[in-house]
């Protein structure tokens, strides 16, 4: 499925840490016939979701013991943990994850600039989906967004679909931040590739718009069904960002950040041979993984989990 969207390598994302052992088992048994699993990303469980239309959901009890269980359950596959650093007890957990060689990101946070910078000083080195579920830039306190942009040691993720961040905000990010410290992401949900319509997912009713955005029945943005290539098209066509810069932010920078640049991120002799061929309208024509053709649009069409879509469609 993901190969049909031009994806050759992934960190599957879990929100509930109880899923780590299941994903680790899949990763261990997975033979890459499409997107290759390189690690696991845990977005939570310690998040401060006040940014989502004023909803404060709280967070589970935080402890180093819980963090140790997450690492154990992941069987070495856990590479990235996203956390709200202002949560009491977060610094001890951050220190533990870093001691295990796991990258820590700031995510779903309600902190101000000073608090955000304190989190980065503790070793956080990634800002999760910059601008989304974090404190905004204000002329008296530039908040979580400003902290991510101004801290040169921090790599910022960007959702570049034009809705999670408006294009003008994306321009600000790219004017302020060194492009070597920006990573394009999709924020895709399991509904990635699903047709326009109404579904029951994540324990609620959701709607996929014609633009590919996932909305709750109250209109709250709940992620995207559009892949990274959609964001690349937006940046090139609407903001006139050179394609080479987009590819650096989408491919090379993540490979460097997470330690895979020796084999991933560029097309060079000795690397894996992960190649995506597109047409002039950014449709995926062919995807190669380690030099092997794993997707052919003419032969395969658009691939997604049809039984899953049928089960959740309303």
Name each model feature, range by range.
Residues 16-23, 86-88, 105-109, 159-171, ...:
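Active-site glycine- and acidic-residue-rich loops that bind
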Residues 256, 266-314:
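C-terminal cap of metal-dependent C-N hydrolases
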Residues 1-9, 48-75, 117-134, 141-155, ...:
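Active-site gating loops and adjacent loop-to-helix segments of metal-dependent hydrolytic enzymes
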Residues 2, 42, 97, 127, ...:
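Conserved, mostly hydrophobic/aromatic
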Residues 143-156, 175-186, 191-277:
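His/Asp/Glu-enriched, well-ordered alpha-helical/loop segment
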Residues 1-21, 35-48, 75-86, 102-105, ...:
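Divalent metal-dependent hydrolysis catalytic cores, especially in the metallo-beta-lactamase
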Residues 19-21, 83-98, 113-117, 137-145:
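Active-site-adjacent beta->alpha loops and helix N-cap segments on the catalytic face
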Residues 74-77, 93-104, 120-126, 150-155, ...:
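Glycine-enriched alpha-helix->loop->beta-strand junction motifs that scaffold or abut catalytic
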């Amino acid at each position: 499925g993901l190969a049909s969207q031009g994806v050759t390598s992934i960190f599957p994302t879990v929100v509930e840490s109880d899923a780590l052992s299941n994903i680790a088992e899949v990763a261990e048994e997975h033979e890459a016939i499409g997107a290759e699993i390189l690690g696991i990303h845990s977005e939570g469980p310690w998040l401060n979701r006040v940014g989502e239309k004023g909803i404060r959901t709280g967070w589970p009890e935080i402890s180093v013991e819980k963090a140790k269980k997450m690492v154990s359950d992941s069987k070495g596959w856990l590479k990235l943990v996203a956390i709200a650093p202002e949560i009491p007890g977060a610094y001890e957990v951050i220190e533990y994850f870093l001691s295990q060689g796991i990258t820590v990101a700031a995510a779903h946070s309600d902190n101000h600039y000073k608090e955000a910078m304190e989190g980065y000083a503790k070793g956080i080195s990634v800002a999760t989906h910059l601008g989304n579920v974090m404190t905004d830039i204000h002329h008296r306190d530039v908040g979580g967004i400003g902290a991510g942009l101004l801290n040169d040691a921090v790599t910022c993720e960007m959702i570049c679909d034009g809705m999670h961040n408006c294009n003008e905000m994306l321009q600000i990010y790219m004017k302020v931040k060194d492009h070597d410290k920006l990573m394009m992401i999709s924020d895709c949900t399991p509904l990635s590739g699903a047709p326009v319509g109404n579904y029951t997912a994540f324990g609620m009713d959701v709607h996929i718009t014609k633009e590919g955005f996932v909305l709750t029945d109250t209109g709250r943005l709940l992620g995207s069904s559009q892949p990274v290539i959609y964001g690349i098209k937006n940046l090139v066509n609407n903001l006139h960002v050179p394609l080479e810069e987009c590819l650096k932010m989408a491919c090379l920078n993540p490979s460097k950040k997470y330690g895979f640049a020796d084999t991933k991120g560029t097309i060079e002799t000795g690397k894996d041979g992960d190649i995506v061929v597109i047409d002039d309208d950014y449709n995926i024509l062919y995807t190669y993984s380690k030099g092997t053709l794993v997707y052919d649009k003419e032969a395969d069409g658009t691939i997604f989990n049809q039984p899953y879509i049928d089960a959740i469609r309303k």
